[in-house]
Amino acid sequence: MTTPGGDTPLPDPAFPEDRYPCLPYLEEEYRKRVRLGRGRLARSTVVFCGLARDVAPALPATRARLERAGALCADYRVVIVENDSRDETPDLLARWRRDDDRVDVLSEELGLPRLPAGRGRARMEQLAACRNRYLDRIDDRYDDADYVIVVDTDLPSGFSYQGLLS
């Protein structure tokens, strides 16, 4: 898989489905749900959305995964809210936006402090405020979408495509 320009290889977006097997007694039902989900998604418009801050190391793989997931849909959009990154995240997102008109990036310097990971109230309020930015954008521009799927943009292992379909 390469970038739309064709010269930069993107990471393999494959998810190690075999490392997370379905319980044997649920296998038949799971396969049925995946099959039905594949048909439903193929007829649907989906908005994938998420937050990004200093996620440059994971962003090429996230991009590849979202493009692969988007290919399962009749149509899709990606809405990413980025703020206060100190790495190459804004540049990578701007390049993705230039390469693909389905990608919508809100990038801004808010001066928000870095808060430690965890469940602290201040961090949750900060994340909620940023989340509301992409919800507003979706309401303004993509309210005809059939589904909205929130993604973590910094997951090293990605997400299960079969799980998405189920």
Walk through the language-model features, giving the residues of each.
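Short beta-strand/loop segment that forms part of the nucleotide-sugar
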Residues: 75-84, 107-108
